[in-house]
């Protein structure tokens, strides 16, 4: 087993997750089996009870694990299925150590950070690294370990010490350290001092980086690479320049030459036995990835989607939704133009308190090609979401509601079409007589952590739903598996009345009691799903519900359905520079003075 540690210095949020994912992707192109572990040095057991504004999106795994958003990156890049154990937190480690102490596993020893906590961390990494994560069902060859936060923070001290010891446990020949640092530009000059200091800090803790990934605005100058090489005691070939690019999908190509060449030699990868089947799959994956990124740069026609959410101040709160929209836009041959609307700005009260924000928000909603309302918790902004759903329904604007987004669409329909006065959700008004959304009876109302309906669960399309556009995108299957994260459901007592009003519950759970999918028949695309389709979307395999929204917004959905094509990429024949240039030529406006290219 080979291990790659990815750590960060200077500042957090520097792109360690993308670099870790890109490293894994490059190794997979060689036919190797790769897994990933994310270490989060916070005391929380998991990310389940954390606000998205505090830590970004809570990503949900097949087994119901509520984990850091970086595990979403790993799954998207590496096409693997991880478990909650692939996310290590201080809370989990300490909980395990305390349980062992209570059982007497330490035989009366004084329990300390070293060796007991550090050993627990190392044992965890070694155990999880051997769990199969792909379709081969075989033990991985390489494990990428990302250490969250910034080296030097007090929270990560035990994990850094554990990794220092771990490099000797597994052997130098099986362990590579990549340190990600920032190279800022001051007065037009790339500065290396922050990187030098970060490397000194890491060395003082016992870890010597093998590769230094330098995040920078522009490509690193040769003199800067030489300076980092000199003062950080690495060869110039061990300094990786990771400059800003148009899309994170380009990062693997930035790293390909230096990183892959170094790992091949250091890990003696040519000695690892790789089946012809996996080697060919790796080659095909890399070819597809390059075609995808090449085509992305030549997209000119836009599709405008407005996201009406509660946590728009931190876009990482919706990172999987953003990526899923990008995947679908690329599949449609469109450049995604994503506009953000704070849901509360659509509410009538905002017209009084902040009319500028109110009118700006409504202008974005009214001019969008499509509307997406994602999941969320709490009452803030809910009336704004309901207003957005009403606009989409009445004006034939393509709409997708995810989790809460489906619930607000049902509330709006109940009020406006079915005449259910005061229809609302038990989440926001427990005393309301007409709550069309209610608490699920099996859910613990007192304990928040890990008590929702979580993980991969089946949804069954109902009889007589053959007309459904969403079902057609799923190739008319009877059942789909999607990841869930919710406490509330559509009130079964109102289902019949809602269906009489004209909304169809085309998907239900295995018992036929829980409403999973809504769709409006006489609409270009009006769909709500109780699950979170964004969690399973991949660059080469977009999510059908989200693809449906983007395709309908681009005016391509009916044509796509009639063509019988798969949502998953089968080839890239229509996604290349030539077709993109044709699109661009279609949008060239000729005037007497000049030819103006309008990106529209």
Curated annotation (Swiss-Prot):
Entry-linked Pfam families: CTP_synth_N, GATase
Domain Glutamine amidotransferase type-1, chain residue ranges per copy: 304-570
Which UniProt key words apply to this protein?
A: ATP-binding, Glutamine amidotransferase, Ligase, Nucleotide-binding, Pyrimidine biosynthesis
Q: Name one GO biological process term.
A: 'de novo' pyrimidine nucleobase biosynthetic process
The first-level EC class reads ligase
Q: Which reaction equation describes what this protein catalyses?
A: UTP + L-glutamine + ATP + H2O = CTP + L-glutamate + ADP + phosphate + 2 H(+)
CDD domains on file = CTPS_N, GATase1_CTP_Synthase
Where is the catalytic site? Answer: 403, 532, 534
Q: Which InterPro entries match?
A: Class_I_gatase-like, CTP_synthase, CTP_synthase_N, GATASE, GATase1_CTP_Synthase, P-loop_NTPase
Which E.C. number(s) belong to this protein? 6.3.4.2
Q: Which GO terms describe its cellular component?
A: cytoophidium; cytoplasm; cytosol
The pathway entry for this protein reads as: Pyrimidine metabolism; CTP biosynthesis via de novo pathway; CTP from UDP: step 2/2
Q: Which GO terms describe its molecular function?
A: ATP binding; CTP synthase activity; identical protein binding
Family the entry assigns:
Belongs to the CTP synthase family.
Q: What does this protein do?
A: Catalyzes the ATP-dependent amination of UTP to CTP with either L-glutamine or ammonia as the source of nitrogen.
Q: Which PANTHER family match?
A: CTP SYNTHASE, CTP SYNTHASE-RELATED
Name listed for the protein in its UniProt record: CTP synthase
Name the source organism: Schizosaccharomyces pombe (strain 972 / ATCC 24843) (Fission yeast)
């Amino acid at each position: 087993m080979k291990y790659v540690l990815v750590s960060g210095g200077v500042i957090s949020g520097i792109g360690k997750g993308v670099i870790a994912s890109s490293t894994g992707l490059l190794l997979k192109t060689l036919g190797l089996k790769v897994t990933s572990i994310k270490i989060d040095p916070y005391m929380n057991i998991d990310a389940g009870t954390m606000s998205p504004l505090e830590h970004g999106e809570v990503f949900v795994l097949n087994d119901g694990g509520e984990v850091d958003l970086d595990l979403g990156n790993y799954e998207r890049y590496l096409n693997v299925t991880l478990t909650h154990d692939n996310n290590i937190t201080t809370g989990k480690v300490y909980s395990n150590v305390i349980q062992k102490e209570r059982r007497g596993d330490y035989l009366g020893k004084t329990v300390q950070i070293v060796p007991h906590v550090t050993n627990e961390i190392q044992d965890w990494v070694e155990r999880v690294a051997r769990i199969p994560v792909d379709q081969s069902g075989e033990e991985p060859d390489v494990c990428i370990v990302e250490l969250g936060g910034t080296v030097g923070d007090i929270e990560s001290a035990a994990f850094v010490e554990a990794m220092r010891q771990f490099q000797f446990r597994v052997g130098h020949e099986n362990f590579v350290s990549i340190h990600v640092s920032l190279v800022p530009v001051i007065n037009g000059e790339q500065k290396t001092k922050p990187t030098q200091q970060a490397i000194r800090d890491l060395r003082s803790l016992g870890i010597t980086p093998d590769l230094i990934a330098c995040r920078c605005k522009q490509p690193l100058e040769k003199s800067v690479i030489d300076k980092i090489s000199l003062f950080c005691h690495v060869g110039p070939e061990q300094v990786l320049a990771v400059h800003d690019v148009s899309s994170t999908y380009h990062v693997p190509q930035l790293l390909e030459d230096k990183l892959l060449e170094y790992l091949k030699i250091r890990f003696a990868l040519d000695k690892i036995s790789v089946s012809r089947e996996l080697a060919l799959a790796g080659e095909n994956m890399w070819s597809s990835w390059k075609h995808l990124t090449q085509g992305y740069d030549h997209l000119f026609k836009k599709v405008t989607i407005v996201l009406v959410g509660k946590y728009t101040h931190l876009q990482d709160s919706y990172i999987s939704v953003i990526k899923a929209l990008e995947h679908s836009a690329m599949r449609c041959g469109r450049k995604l133009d994503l506009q953000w609307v704070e849901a509360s700005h659509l509410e009538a009260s905002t017209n009084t308190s902040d009319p500028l924000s109110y009118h700006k928000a409504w202008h974005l909603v009214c001019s969008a090609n499509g509307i997406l309302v994602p999941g969320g918790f709490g009452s803030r902004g809910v009336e704004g979401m309901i207003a957005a759903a009403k606009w989409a329904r009445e004006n034939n604007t393509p709409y997708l509601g995810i989790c809460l987004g489906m619930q607000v669409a049902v509330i709006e329909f109940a009020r406006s079409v079915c005449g259910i006065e005061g229809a609302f959700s038990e989440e926001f008004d427990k005393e309301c007589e007409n709550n069309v959304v209610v608490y699920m009876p099996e859910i613990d109302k007192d304990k928040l952590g890990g008590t929702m309906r979580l993980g991969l669960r089946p949804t069954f399309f109902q009889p007589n739903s053959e007309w459904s556009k969403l079902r057609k995108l799923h190739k008319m299957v009877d059942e789909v598996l999607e990841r869930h994260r919710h406490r509330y459901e559509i009130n079964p007592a109102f289902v019949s009345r809602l269906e009489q009003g004209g909304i169809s519950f085309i998907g239900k759970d295995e018992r036929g009691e829980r409403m999973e999918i809504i769709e409006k028949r006489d609409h270009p695309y009006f769909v709500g799903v109780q699950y979170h389709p964004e969690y399973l979307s991949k660059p080469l395999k977009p999510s059908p519900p989200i693809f449906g929204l983007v395709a309908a917004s681009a005016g391509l959905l009916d044509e796509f359905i009639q063509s019988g094509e798969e949502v998953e990429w089968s080839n890239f024949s229509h996604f290349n520079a030539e077709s993109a240039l044709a699109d661009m030529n279609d949008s060239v406006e000729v005037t007497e003075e000049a030819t103006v290219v309008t990106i529209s």
